[in-house]
């Protein structure tokens, strides 16, 4: 739907516009994954992304972003401070993802910021900050 129906409609109305994905949590992971799978996007805002997802590091290490992209990533500074063993990996995985993206030739700009708080603190503000950053 996104590539076959939605994007052609957007491009017909705004032919010169760049297309960025924006996501928080699992949608942040999806936004990043879409850059690895499709050439139709110019970047993504990925806030508090679910990069703890099993085998994500392996996937990201074996793939390249498909087209020149600007990427904004952020994470709350308390998100990795949890007793949940899976969720506690999110900080290391996010730092690792940033390193992978720095080495990707199609990543033209990469922003990575830490925000105060946990996963559920001010998601709208965090997303707005990311959008402002990549469009700024």
Q: Where do the protein language model's features map onto the residues?
A:
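Non-catalytic cap/lid and distal C-terminal segments of serine-dependent acyl enzymes
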Residues: 1-136
């Amino acid at each position: 739907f996104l590539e076959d129906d939605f994007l052609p409609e957007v491009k017909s109305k705004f032919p010169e516009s760049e297309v960025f994905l924006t996501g928080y949590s699992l949608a942040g992971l999806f936004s990043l994954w879409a850059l690895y799978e499709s050439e139709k996007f110019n970047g993504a805002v990925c806030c508090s992304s679910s990069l703890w997802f099993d085998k994500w590091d392996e996937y990201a290490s074996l793939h390249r972003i498909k087209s020149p992209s600007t990427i904004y990533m952020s994470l709350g500074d308390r998100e990795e401070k949890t007793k949940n063993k899976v969720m506690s990996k999110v900080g290391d995985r996010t730092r690792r993802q940033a390193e992978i993206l720095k080495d990707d030739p199609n990543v033209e700009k990469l922003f990575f910021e830490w925000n105060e708080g946990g996963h559920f603190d001010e998601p709208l503000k965090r997303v707005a900050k990311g959008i402002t950053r990549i469009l700024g």
